[in-house]
Amino acid sequence: MKRLTVHTAEKAQQYPILIAPDLIKNASLWHLYCSAPHIAIITNETVAPLYLSSLKAALTDKKVIDIILLDGECHKNLATYQHILTTLLEAHLGRDGLLIALGGGVINDITGFVAATYQRGICWITFPTTLLAQVDAAVGGKTGVNHACGKNMIGAFYPPQAVLMDTATLSTLPPREFSAGLAEVIKYALIYDISFLSWLEQHMDAVLRKEKISLENMIMNCCRYKSEIVCADEREQGMRALLNFGHTFGHALETITAYRHWLHGEAVAIGMRMAAELSEMRGLISADEKARVISLLQRAHLPTAIDIQLNCEDIYQTLFLDKKVRAGQLRFVLLSGLGQAHVVDDVTETEIFAVIAASRSENESFARF
């Protein structure tokens, strides 16, 4: 079992990340972290048939309720949040209760937000079942829901008391979902560690085959990178903002399509390509380096171009709904080279339109799984 401790400097808290196969069946581990008398498991219609019974079997001496939500980013909203709150209140879950997030990034985000706000805050544990959640959403304490006007506009910083990652859950993950998670993996390599970029280029085939050692090493590296960044900047006042590489463009694409055309990781992949285009336009990276970015994304079976008709002006205006906008200025994370990045707030409308045009090449295609 691999173990990592995340330190949150602001509140002087820490919580463990445990990584191993078959954690869901480890009753002694669950009892170690689930001392609460009343537990609510929040999951969705896709994950519940796969893992809910195994988790409940490990908690037989507890009073456990489950809340099964509809699957998809389009359900990460205030209506779903309200439904969860009502269910918890009707079940008389007290402040000594515990929430368990059983699922991917959407389940992680909404469960954490409920935990942050229900009766002014209760404990929660996250058990991420997707690659995207394991390498990104479950680490760092960001929680929230979407609003019709923008992604993750309502939320809180509220870390869990533990993150339990069962790598065996990735065996049931559809190929498209697995590739979506690889977008966040590639992000760390591009902004933080060029040696990890080389490792991914060498091991991508093994990762796609879900080979155990490669998979565990990759996940551990990503969790370590994010924990280092979160420890230095929990509330995104500085270094943590670099984790938004590809997300400003990506969130706009998700918002404008109502979260129904691309998975989050797919939108981020296109967003990273767009950020790489902008970085090259500004002379920050070479054409060969940009090509290296696009090549790795494509090897991971990720889209790198806008494949539907979207109006440039609509995309541009949607960018301003991003929560990272400051004093009316868009903020983008650009590459300073491969393995390093920085934030800029002086990108012009002309540059953005040029990036959009360059990122919808008809010579590129993406075959959905």
From Swiss-Prot:
Provide the GO biological process annotations. Answer: amino acid biosynthetic process; aromatic amino acid family biosynthetic process; chorismate biosynthetic process
Note on how the cofactor is bound: Binds 1 divalent metal cation per subunit. Can use either Co(2+) or Zn(2+).
Q: Give residues annotated as binding Zn(2+).
A: 184, 247, 264
The EC code for this enzyme is 4.2.3.4
What reaction is this protein's catalytic activity?
7-phospho-2-dehydro-3-deoxy-D-arabino-heptonate = 3-dehydroquinate + phosphate
Chief localisation class: cytoplasm
Record-given protein name: 3-dehydroquinate synthase
UniProt source species = Dichelobacter nodosus (strain VCS1703A)
The gene behind this protein is aroB
